[in-house]
Structure formats: structure tokens, C-alpha cells
Regions:
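C-terminal amphipathic alpha-helical interaction region
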Residues: 1-73, 116, 134-164
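Conserved mixed alpha/beta catalytic, RNA-binding, or beta-rich assembly cores of soluble enzyme
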Residues: 46-107
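Phosphate-backbone binding interfaces of nucleic-acid-interacting proteins
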Residues: 84-91, 99-103, 108-164
Length: 164
């Protein structure tokens, strides 16, 4: 799992206005700004099956998907901050790869990458070579991966009984 963090800060980007041949530096105050919501810590306790309930991912998250050429991209957004640690624990690259093995080139040996997007309560997955060529080059029912997010929302996730 990798994190995606925007690296450019407003104070590090020179801002100029160009009028004809002249350039004018512009100073922009860089105080305040977006403060992302806190994210719940990873669960540390090991729960027994009697202490958990298994629910479909759709109870805990939203999803959206699409194509990047022959690759499928799936974004998963937790409905509440306290759900995110359970999403991270359940939706490993291996779990998502196995779940989508029927569409991945190489089956269960196919390649899936995962990124966390701090402050957005979300995960992003890239399923390599999952679209049979993608777009007009594919003979699949969903050549642009638009259904993949909806398919993933059926994935079973175990959570503590009191969480929901």
C-alpha cells in the first residue's frame, strides 16, 4: 500500500501575472486552508467470530470505478471515519486481486495496487490488465470498468457488532 500525498505547497509555488512582456510577482498569504478530518486508528484487538458481524462493503463505503486504458481504477470511500480501519484491513491488494481474478490477466497472479488517500477516508485500487484491452479494443460486457466499483461493494467485511 502506498500513500498519495499532494506535495506542492502554496508557499513553494511562485505566482506571477504576465501583462504583455512584463511579469509581476504576486504575494498570496498562505494561512489557513483545508484541514483533513482525523482518521480512526487501526484496530488492535483480535475479535472472535462471535464478536463480529460480516456485512457487504456497501454498508460501510461508497465506490466509483472506471478505466485507465486496459486497467480498471476503483475508489472506495468510507461512510464514517471509524469504518476506514476495517476497510483497510479487509481490502488488501491480495483480497481485491482474488476477488477480481476472473477479469485479471493472469487470474489470481494478476497485479493489483492500492493507495491510501489521507484525509479523504478513501482507498484507491488499480487493477492491471483487467479490461480485455479496454474501450473499443475489448469484447467484454464492461470494457471501461464502470461496474467494478459496484461489484466490489458486495465484498464481505467483518466488523465488531457494536460498530454499526
Amino acid at each position: 500500500t502506498r500513500e498519495y500525498l499532494p506535495t506542492a505547497q502554496l508557499t513553494q509555488v511562485p505566482i506571477e501575472v504576465v501583462v504583455g512582456e512584463q511579469r509581476f510577482a504576486v504575494s498570496v498569504p498562505a494561512s489557513g486552508g483545508f484541514v483533513p478530518p482525523g482518521e480512526a486508528a487501526e484496530p488492535t484487538e483480535q475479535l472472535t467470530p462471535s464478536e463480529t458481524v460480516t456485512v457487504p462493503l456497501i454498508r460501510l463505503a461508497l465506490a466509483r470505478s472506471g478505466d485507465k486504458g486496459d486497467h480498471a481504477n476503483i475508489g472506495v470511500i468510507a461512510r464514517k471515519p471509524e469504518y476506514l480501519p476495517y476497510l483497510r484491513a479487509a481490502l488488501t491488494t491480495e483480497a481485491v486481486r482474488d476477488y477480481f481474478a476472473h477479469v485479471l490477466a493472469g487470474g489470481s497472479a494478476g497485479k493489483v495496487e492500492r493507495w491510501t488517500l489521507p484525509g479523504t477516508l478513501s482507498l484507491n485500487f488499480l487493477l492491471h490488465h483487467a479490461l480485455g484491452g479496454g474501450g473499443a479494443g475489448s469484447l467484454r460486457t464492461d470494457p471501461q470498468g464502470k461496474y467494478f466499483g459496484q461489484m466490489l461493494l458486495d465484498y464481505p467485511v467483518a466488523v465488531p457488532r457494536g460498530l454499526l
